[in-house]
C-alpha cells in the first residue's frame, strides 16, 4: 500500500470514497436521513478543495486506487475514511499513524478527533479516550459523535 500526500487531482476520487464509505460502512449506526445530512449526494467541491488544501492530507493507494484518506490541522484529526471494501486491512491505521506522527513532529502533545459511532472503536484501539459524547446538527439533522483525545 502506497501512502502519499493528497493532490488536487485526487478530489473527485476522495469525494466518491467519502460518500460510499459513509453510506455503506456507517449505515449500521445512523439512519438514512442522518447519512444524507453527513454525506450528501452533491458535495460542496469548493469547500472540500479549500479544506484539504489548508490541512495536511494523506491518501493510501492500492494498485493506483485511493483506498483511504485523512487530514489533520495541527493536533486535530479532521477526517479519516477507508473504502468500504478495505475496512480492516490496515489502511486506516497507516493513514492515522502518519497523521499522528506529522502532528507530533510539529510539536503537538496530543491529537483530538470527533469520531462517529462507527469509528469510535477504531480510535479507542489506537489509544484515544472519549472526552465527551456530543450531538451535532448537520442540515437540520442531529447526529451523535464523540470528542476523543490521544496524548502522545
Residue ranges with predicted function:
Residues 96, 103-116:
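Conserved GNAT acetyl-CoA-binding A-motif
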Amino acid at each position: 500500500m502506497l501512502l502519499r500526500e493528497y493532490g488536487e487531482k485526487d478530489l473527485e476520487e476522495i469525494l466518491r470514497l467519502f460518500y460510499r464509505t459513509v453510506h455503506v460502512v456507517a449505515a449500521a449506526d445512523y439512519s438514512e436521513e442522518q447519512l444524507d445530512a453527513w454525506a450528501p449526494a452533491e458535495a460542496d467541491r469548493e469547500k472540500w478543495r479549500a479544506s484539504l488544501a489548508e490541512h495536511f492530507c494523506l491518501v493510501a493507494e492500492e494498485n493506483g486506487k485511493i483506498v483511504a484518506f485523512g487530514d489533520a490541522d495541527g493536533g486535530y484529526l479532521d477526517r479519516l475514511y477507508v473504502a468500504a471494501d478495505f475496512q480492516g486491512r490496515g489502511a486506516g491505521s497507516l493513514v492515522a499513524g502518519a497523521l499522528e506522527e506529522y502532528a507530533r513532529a510539529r510539536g503537538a502533545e496530543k491529537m483530538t478527533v470527533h469520531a462517529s459511532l462507527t469509528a469510535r472503536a477504531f480510535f479507542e484501539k489506537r489509544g484515544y479516550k472519549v472526552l465527551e459524547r456530543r450531538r451535532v446538527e448537520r442540515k437540520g439533522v442531529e447526529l451523535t459523535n464523540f470528542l476523543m483525545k490521544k496524548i502522545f
